[in-house]
Amino acid sequence: MGETRHFFLTGCASGIAKHLTGVLLGQGHSVFATDVNLEALENAAREGAWPVERVRLRALDVRDADAWENVFAEAVREFGHIDICMNIAGLLLAAWATDQPINEVHSQIDVNVKGVIFGTRVAARHMVLRGKGHIINIASIAGLTPVPGMAVYAATKYAVRAYSISACMELRKKGVYVTAICPASVQTPMLDGQLHNDAADLFYSGYRMLTVDEIEHAIFKRAMRRRPPYEVHVPRLKTKLAKFVDNFPAVGPIFAPLYQWSGRRRQAQRRAEEQRAK
């Protein structure tokens, strides 16, 4: 990223988007940072000493299509145009398929799927007029493979990936690219919220969690190219295994118990650490 650019990000009060906002501002870019929780967003800005001359903080409920229209239009008025839109806001609520409360089904679909669709739609219309632009949507490894214990969440991330790739096929000829980022588990407050949820054991499997720095690298080095890819998988080996299980779902029950055992073990370790820290 040589020249300075104008970015629009969602979910900036915490996690991946909070980290990326700080990095982008540190590189001299302008960021229109949004979150459903404006107070938490303002706290993040103070903690990170985000430069007021290059950042705008606004409340945005990504589930609200009208709010998307209004807030994105304000971003265009503020910066003149938006070069890159990152749909990062998401919601993870693990539960067994038959036990997930209906309100949690709605909330995950509304935030993870509709929020991304509304954001991509608004950003793409603006970018098509300019003949260039890039939309980056955070999907998940759960969009590459079935995830027992997170059936609804996985369904939303399959949807994000499918929508992003389909939209990119439509928009590339108009100079606008859409990239789906599909990471394995990332150490963020959202994942921390599932520490005591047994249904989330698969997301705690493996030898370690990804860091927000690794997502930063995946986006800046692998996604933001002259001709951006349709999707980026992080890390490569684990996501290749995920795709294998997706292509041959009958092998899933063979691998799942081992990964669930690993996840439960890690959850127990983290819970013990949490107790000792109290």
Regions found by a protein language model. Name each.
Residues 140:
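Residue(s) in the substrate-gating loop at a strand-loop-helix junction
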Residues 2-32:
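Canonical Rossmann dinucleotide-binding motif of NAD(H)/NADP(H)-dependent dehydrogenases/reductases
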Residues 27-43:
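Conserved glycine-rich Rossmann-like NAD(P)H-binding loop of the short-chain dehydrogenase/reductase
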Residues 59-70, 102:
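The beta1-alpha1 cofactor-binding region of Rossmann-like NAD(H)/NADP(H)-dependent oxidoreductases
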Residues 172-236:
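SDR active-site lid
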Residues 96-97, 101-109:
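Substrate-binding pocket helix/loop in short-chain dehydrogenase/reductase
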Residues 120, 156:
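Active-site helix of classical SDR
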